[in-house]
Regions:
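Catalytic center-proximal scaffold of phosphoryl-transfer enzymes
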Residues: 1-281
């Protein structure tokens, strides 16, 4: 029953009321909200070694998609962080949205490439970054819809993105380096031209601030140029966040992070959350 309760709550994303109603119907028993919490807390405690093992694997990953979003605990703002590698997904909820979280989860010597947005914590933590092209292209697209004189900039950015995507691990390193240098020079020219447009200056500043990190994929074509994988894995948690509303305490947040880490990792690897959790317990 504990497997069923936990997955109804965190995999099927049922509200507490519906979780209780489903279990009471299926097992002809009576449940309280405290019982549901106690069960999921015991499951999370048993899952802690597996959770920590995923954290160790995340630390060894050659590249990571990292993202963060707000979450409420007792009405106060916390941050839900996701760390996703090729085969693992790791969630953690913290008060901070800064480098301290990266130091805690990845340690002080992580040398993999981080695919991320423009949060300054990433640049403070590492110089091995790939800025997310999906984010910046959404910004330039929105500007182009509002201002005709922003359309050439958006098209130019799309052309640069096409060059970023065009590189392959089969391309010789020297060829990739030439393309990298060419793209950096092109982007500098773009910034120079469009930074004088006051209504575009915010976006050109964003582009300027990430200049060293837009073209990392050209040198390392094994990585993705967008953080879509991170955002995709975060999406289910965002849906759950809307269903749950505000979490009651940090213990409940810890339960959610641990269970969803395991469920998301199992799904990413094509494993059944039901049988995997049952075997773990």
């Amino acid at each position: 029953m504990q497997t069923q309760i936990t997955l109804l709550r965190f995999d099927d994303r049922l509200p507490l009321r519906k979780t209780i109603a489903t279990i009471e119907r299926q097992y002809e028993t009576t449940l309280t909200s405290k019982t549901v919490y106690d069960v999921t807390k015991r499951v999370a405690d048993k899952a802690t070694p597996a959770y920590n093992d995923i954290k160790r694997k995340i630390r060894r990953a050659t590249h990571l998609h990292i993202d963060e979003t707000k979450i409420k605990i007792q009405g106060k703002t916390y941050w839900l962080w996701i760390f996703r590698s090729r085969n693992n997904v790791f969630f953690v909820i913290r008060k901070q949205r800064n480098r301290k979280v990266l130091d805690e989860i990845l340690g002080y010597r992580y040398r993999g490439i981080i695919i991320c947005d423009g949060l300054s914590a990433y640049e403070e933590y590492s110089r091995y970054l790939q800025r997310c092209w999906a984010h910046i292209l959404r910004e330039t697209r929105d500007l182009a819809k509002k201002h005709d004189d922003a359309k050439p900039m958006h098209q130019w950015m799309k052309d640069l993105f096409a060059k970023v995507k065009s590189t392959s691990v089969r391309d010789p390193p020297k060829k990739r380096k030439r393309l990298y240098d060419k793209c950096v020079q092109e982007m500098k020219k773009l910034i120079e031209i469009f930074s004088s447009y006051q209504h575009i200056s915010k976006v050109t500043t964003t582009i300027q601030n990430g200049l060293d990190f837009w073209f990392t994929r050209i040198i390392h074509p094994q990585i993705e140029p967008t953080n879509n994988n991170g955002e995709r894995s975060l999406r289910e948690m965002v849906v759950m966040k809307k269903i749950i509303g505000t979490l009651r305490n940090e213990d409940g947040a810890d339960v959610m992070a641990k269970v969803m880490t395991l469920v998301s990792t199992w799904r990413l690897n094509g494993a059944s959350p039901y049988y995997s959790l049952k075997a773990l317990l």
